[in-house]
Amino acid sequence: ATFAFIILLWTLGGFNQDPFISETLSIQGEALSGSKLFKINCVGCHGISAQGLLGPDLHDATKELSDKKIINQVIKGLTPPMPSFEIDPQSMADLLAYMHSLNK
C-alpha cells in the first residue's frame, strides 16, 4: 500500500513539483505590474506589444502553454536564444497575469 501511494504521488507530481513554481502559482499576479516587467525585460525580443520579433508572438501563448511551462521557459531559457531570468515569484506571477491579458 505504501509503494502504491508513493507511485500515485510521483505520477501526480507530488515529488517533482518545483517549489518556485508552486509558490508562483499560489500568488495572484497583477497584469499592470507584469506589463511593466515585460517592457523592461522582454520587448527587445518579443516586441513592444508582444507581437514577436526575434522571439515569438506571445498573444494566446497562455492558451497553448501551461503556466508551469511558461514559468520554466522564463527561468530556464529552454529554447535558444531565450535567456534565463532570475525573477522572484511575485514578479513571475505578475508576468503570467500580463501574458494571460494578451489572450484574444
PLM feature segments, named:
Residues 1-29, 88, 100-104:
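Post-cleavage N-terminal segment of exported redox proteins
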Residues 14-17, 22-23, 44-45, 59, ...:
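Intrinsically disordered, low-complexity segments enriched in polar/charged residues with Gly/Pro
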Residues 26-51, 68, 72-76:
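Sequence/structural segment immediately N-terminal to covalent heme-attachment motifs in c-type
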Residues 49, 59-104:
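Extracytoplasmic electron-transfer domains, predominantly the class I c-type cytochrome c fold
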Residues 54-58:
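Short cysteine/histidine-rich zinc-coordinating motifs and their immediately flanking basic loops
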